[in-house]
C-alpha cells in the first residue's frame, strides 16, 4: 500500500506538468492543488496550508524532489507545482 500511495502521490504532482499552459491561479490548477492536499491528508498526515506551502517550496528547490517530479511530469513541472501551491496557500 505504501508504494501504491507513493505512486499515486507522484502522479498527482506530475499532473502539474500537463497544466503549465494555464495560469497557476486557474481553477483547474487550483483544484489539482486541493486534490494533492486532500490525498496527503488522507494517506499520510494532516496537510495544513502551512505544510503544503513548505512542500511546494521543496518541490521547486532544485533537489531530488524537483528531479523526480520533472522526470514524471516533464520539464518545469516541479516549478509550476510550486507556483500553483504558493498561489493556493498564500493567495
What do the predicted segments below correspond to?
Residues 1-91:
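Amphipathic alpha-helical "stalk" segments
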Amino acid at each position: 500500500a505504501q508504494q501504491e500511495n507513493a505512486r499515486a502521490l507522484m502522479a498527482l504532482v506530475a499532473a502539474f506538468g500537463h497544466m503549465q499552459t494555464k495560469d497557476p491561479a486557474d481553477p483547474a490548477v487550483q483544484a489539482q492543488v486541493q486534490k494533492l492536499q486532500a490525498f496527503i491528508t488522507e494517506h499520510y498526515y494532516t496537510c495544513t496550508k502551512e505544510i503544503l506551502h513548505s512542500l511546494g517550496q521543496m518541490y521547486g528547490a532544485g533537489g531530488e524532489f524537483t528531479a523526480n517530479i520533472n522526470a514524471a511530469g516533464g520539464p518545469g513541472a516541479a516549478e509550476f507545482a510550486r507556483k500553483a501551491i504558493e498561489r493556493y496557500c498564500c493567495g
